[in-house]
């Protein structure tokens, strides 16, 4: 080892890899040189180089979303670390495992006016589950200091990936020399205390058993409630667990006779039989459904305001929320039973205790769902083509196992309204923790890097695209081909749905904020093929060609926000008129 900094960084990074870290995003700088070299030289860790810290952090967030394991992001000192903050907020709010490693100046330079030096100790506050200001490397470290680096790495991975999942911040100060040059008085060979275990295992193994079935004391009261009420719902919000959960939801719906209403980014919308996705259209109107007597909830707070409003029409329903993380997610404050348990284990334990129910209630939802999608399909064929139609067609055209990222603001709501459930399994993602429009492109590309064998599509609005155009550099730099659908209504189209739209000129000038940008230039600069489309035939052709070729393509559909809203409302009214 040339010097103390390289020894410390190499020991820490080696143990992170042994604890399961496989992906890291590196932003260039000087103070983080020991960390950059340690990560770049480790054979078990895939390294992604980014020029910009904000994009790097969101890309790492996407990696963690795609792999369901912690990803790391590394930067130098100063405002570079502050640029991690938006992604860290999203990771905390959404329960995504993320490691933030920030290099820092030594303690004697803090609060001294030294260049590129800010207070980085616990700088992410309550948005980090664990923050550590790591000790400065020493020339002749005692064995316990080196063992601490390995247990620190193991603990960081365990906390980020445990329940509730979230952010771990390691702040690492270094004195020069930062490069791998010899330093007089430093150890020339790693001491025994720095060595890993001979068998390749982590220095500290955090062993988690498979989630046990909830005890009878938990299951029996819930089963009794469900048996008493025929008019119930299963509701799956964003960020439901993967694995067997979706199939178990379908089975539970069949057993209870409760329709399963699933959010577009719940992980249960696409690929699971019998789920309901057209609820926004048929719950209200002339053929409105009566409120449920019991609601069994999974996942985070719903995207759909209409579904939330419908659930709130119940006078005093039983609302049971099951969540392994134990994190509260009920902004209506209607939950009567909060169950902290592994969701799949809970359903497995519950199903045998229920009598299978042939339910006219569930059948009414199934029939309404069929009528809704028939009306939607007929309406989308009409001109002019609009944003919701494009989202419907993306779902129709994506192949089995594809990755889909939907941007916040309108696209995620379009997915909830126009993303038809189907037999093909599509992994749909969105940043619904803090629901910001920043970093969406970078998150999408991180997802593509984390699922390299799956085609990647992203649907974003023009303001979202503008916010993260620099993230497009990862298409070439990190080798992530993506089909990006840009729904360009020249400003903040979502504000047309709010009462402020009646107040001009402030509405246009300060809310819609039309920009008139030509995004073809951005596509050219970042090496994407640019395909402008105006109608459904052109869109479907361009999208299918890009996905089939695994090409890097920007498909731009220019729309008018007012026309889009009129088309959407007319389509919903037409669907309701069918009796759905």
UniProtKB/Swiss-Prot annotation:
It is an enzyme of class 2 (transferase). Binds 1 thiamine pyrophosphate per subunit. The keyword Metal-binding applies. It catalyses: isochorismate + 2-oxoglutarate + H(+) = 5-enolpyruvoyl-6-hydroxy-2-succinyl-cyclohex-3-ene-1-carboxylate + CO2. It comes from the Bacteria. Signal peptide: none annotated. The keyword Magnesium applies. InterPro entries: DHS-like_NAD/FAD-binding_dom, MenaQ_synth_MenD, MenD_middle, THDP-binding, Thiamin_PyroP_enz_TPP-bd_dom, TPP_enzyme_TPP-bd. SUPFAM superfamilies: DHS-like NAD/FAD-binding domain, Thiamin diphosphate-binding fold (THDP-binding). Pathway: Quinol/quinone metabolism; 1,4-dihydroxy-2-naphthoate biosynthesis; 1,4-dihydroxy-2-naphthoate from chorismate: step 2/7; Quinol/quinone metabolism; menaquinone biosynthesis. Keywords: Magnesium, Manganese, Menaquinone biosynthesis, Metal-binding, Thiamine pyrophosphate, Transferase. GO terms for biological process: menaquinone biosynthetic process. Transmembrane segments: none annotated. Homodimer. Belongs to the TPP enzyme family. MenD subfamily. Catalyzes the thiamine diphosphate-dependent decarboxylation of 2-oxoglutarate and the subsequent addition of the resulting succinic semialdehyde-thiamine pyrophosphate anion to isochorismate to yield 2-succinyl-5-enolpyruvyl-6-hydroxy-3-cyclohexene-1-carboxylate (SEPHCHC). This is 2-succinyl-5-enolpyruvyl-6-hydroxy-3-cyclohexene-1-carboxylate synthase.
């Amino acid at each position: 080892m040339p010097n103390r900094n390289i020894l410390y960084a190499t020991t820490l990074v080696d143990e992170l890899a042994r604890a399961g870290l496989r992906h890291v995003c590196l932003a260039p700088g000087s103070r983080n040189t020991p960390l950059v070299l340690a990560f770049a030289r480790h054979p078990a860790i895939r390294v992604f180089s980014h020029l910009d810290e904000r994009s790097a952090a969101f890309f790492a967030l996407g990696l963690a979303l795609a792999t369901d394991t912690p990803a790391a992001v590394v930067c130098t000192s100063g405002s570079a670390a502050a640029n991690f903050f938006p992604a860290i907020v999203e990771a905390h709010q959404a329960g995504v495992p993320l490691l933030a490693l920030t290099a820092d100046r030594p303690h004697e330079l803090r609060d001294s006016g030294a260049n590129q030096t800010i207070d980085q100790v616990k700088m992410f506050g309550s948005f980090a589950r664990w923050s550590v200001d790591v000790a400065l490397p020493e020339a002749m470290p005692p064995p316990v200091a080196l063992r601490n680096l390995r247990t620190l790495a193991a603990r960081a991975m365990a906390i980020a990936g445990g329940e509730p999942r979230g952010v771990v911040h390691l702040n690492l100060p270094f004195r020069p020399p930062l490069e791998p040059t010899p330093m007089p008085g430093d150890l020339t060979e790693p001491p025994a205390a720095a060595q890993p275990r001979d068998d390749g295992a982590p220095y500290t193994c955090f062993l988690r058993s498979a989630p046990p079935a909830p005890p009878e004391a938990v299951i029996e009261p819930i089963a009794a409630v469900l048996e008493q009420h025929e008019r119930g719902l299963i509701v799956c919000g964003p960020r439901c667990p993967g694995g067997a959960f979706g199939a178990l939801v379908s089975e539970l719906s069949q057993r209870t006779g409760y329709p399963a209403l699933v959010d577009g980014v719940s992980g249960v919308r696409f690929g699971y039989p019998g789920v309901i996705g057209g609820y926004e259209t048929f719950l209200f109107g002339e053929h409105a459904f009566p409120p449920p007597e019991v609601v069994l909830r999974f996942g985070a707070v719903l995207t759909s305001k209409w579904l939330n409003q419908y659930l709130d029409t119940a006078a005093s329903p039983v609302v049971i929320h099951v969540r392994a993380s134990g994190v509260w997610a009920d902004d209506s404050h209607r939950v009567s039973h909060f169950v902290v348990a592994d969701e799949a284990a809970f359903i497995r334990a519950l199903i045998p205790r229920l009598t299978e129910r042939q339910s006219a209630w569930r059948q009414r939802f199934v029939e309404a769902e069929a009528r809704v999608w028939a009306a939607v399909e007929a309406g989308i064929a009409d001109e002019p083509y609009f944003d919701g139609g494009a989202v419907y067609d993306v779902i129709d055209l994506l192949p089995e196992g594809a990755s889909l990222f939907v941007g916040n603001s309108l696209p995620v709501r379009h997915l909830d309204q126009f993303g038809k459930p189907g037999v093909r399994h599509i992994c749909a993602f969105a940043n619904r923790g803090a629901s910001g429009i920043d970093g969406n492109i970078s998150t999408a590309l991180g997802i593509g890097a984390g699922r390299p064998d799956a085609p990647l599509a992203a649907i974003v609005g023009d303001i979202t695209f503008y916010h993260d155009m620099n993230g497009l550099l990862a298409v070439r730099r990190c080798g992530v081909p993506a089909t990006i659908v840009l729904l360009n209504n020249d400003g903040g189209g979502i504000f047309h749905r709010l009462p402020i739209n009646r107040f001009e000129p402030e509405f246009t000038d300060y809310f819609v904020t039309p920009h008139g940008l030509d995004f073809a230039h951005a596509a050219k600069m970042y090496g994407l093929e640019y395909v402008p489309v105006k109608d459904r035939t052109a869109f479907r052709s361009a999208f299918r060609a890009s996905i089939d070729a695994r090409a890097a393509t920007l498909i731009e559909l220019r729309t008018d926000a007012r026309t889009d809203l009129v088309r959407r409302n007319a389509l919903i009214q037409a669907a309701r008129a069918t009796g759905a």
